[in-house]
Amino acid sequence: MKSKKNLILIGMMGSGKSTIGSLISKELNVKFIDIDSVLEDVTKMKIVEIFEKKGENFFRNLEEKITLKLLNSTNNVISLGGGGFINEKIRNEVLKNNFSFWLNCDTQMLLNRIKNRKKRPIAFNLSDSELTELIAKRTKIYSKAQFKINCHKLTKTEIVKKILKIYGHN
């Protein structure tokens, strides 16, 4: 890994952050940190259980605390949860000291990937139109990332290559 800065992946649930992050970390031979997985390890609960048993406020507070701590590490590939970058403190820290990549996916692709997925607590009870509205709202914030990767019609390998090419020049 050329830089000591973290490579951060942001985007909607279902955009492929965990999959792409894992592949990039293997290519760069660095640690991969999936924030949602860390939250599950810390709470000993699945994300959907945290939402059901503790509520969204508890989840967001814990997500902020853990994410900010992990963003102070270096030389990692980190996948934020879908709502992580929406948090202003997290977003500011990501933009200040890291390389951020937004995995921008076609709305219909995202709808197909996340529809009726029980492990996606925010999306589970939303209609297609409500999900589309959520995607549009988050897109405005995701667009603040340093780099935008349009993932539509790209394979996982092509996405990884695009990110590594950009990352290698910084």
Residue ranges and their predicted role:
Residues S18:
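Walker A/P-loop
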Residues L9:
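Hydrophobic anchor at the beta1->P-loop junction of P-loop NTPases
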Residues S22, K89-N92, N112-N116, K161-K162:
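Short amphipathic alpha-helical segments
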Residues G82-F85, D106-Q108, L154:
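Short glycine-rich anion-binding loops that position phosphate/pyrophosphate groups of nucleotides
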Residues M12:
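P-loop (Walker A) phosphate-binding loop of NTP-binding proteins
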Residues N97-K140:
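A glycine- and Lys/Arg-enriched "phosphate-lid" helix/loop adjacent to the NTP-binding pocket
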